[in-house]
Every structure is written in structure tokens, then in C-alpha cells.
Swiss-Prot record:
One of its GO terms (cellular component) is cytosolic small ribosomal subunit. GO terms for molecular function: small ribosomal subunit rRNA binding; structural constituent of ribosome. Binds as a heterodimer with protein bS6 to the central domain of the 16S rRNA, where it helps stabilize the platform of the 30S subunit. It comes from Alkaliphilus metalliredigens (strain QYMF). Pfam families: Ribosomal_S18. Belongs to the bacterial ribosomal protein bS18 family. Part of the 30S ribosomal subunit. Forms a tight heterodimer with protein bS6. This is Small ribosomal subunit protein bS18. PANTHER family: 30S RIBOSOMAL PROTEIN S18, SMALL RIBOSOMAL SUBUNIT PROTEIN BS18M. The keyword Ribosomal protein applies. The keyword RNA-binding applies.
Amino acid sequence: MVNRRRKKMKKKVCTFCADKSSKIDYKEVHKLKKYVTERGKILPRRISGNCAIHQRDITQAIKRSRHIALLPYTID
């Protein structure tokens, strides 16, 4: 068996906590697209690097913008 060492993942800093003036808004589609995969799924917190509070806000904003057709549910 090969002995593999795991690299320690560096914890990402939440972009919204670092920049206090930045707000999460469902109408700002260009910001929300960073947190959606190419298949249309919402990125998990461990990949996006957001804190729990802001991840919930991003998820809610993405769902709102999908509902009013600013963001697509799926991407072909």
C-alpha cells in the first residue's frame, strides 16, 4: 500500500466578512454566479469559503433570483 499524506487545507476567509460594505442581493446576478456550478448547483460552504451565516444568505438570494428568472435553475 502506498502511504499517502494528506495536505492540510488552508481555511478560506469569508469574502462578505472581510469586506463589510459588500451586501448580498438577489438582483446582483454577477455576484451570485460565482457561487453556482456550471451545472447550476449551489456551491457548498467548504468550497466557496463562506461562513455559515453568509452561506445561508447566498443560498436564499440564489433561490430568489431563480424564482424570478434572473438565474436559471439548470444550465444546458
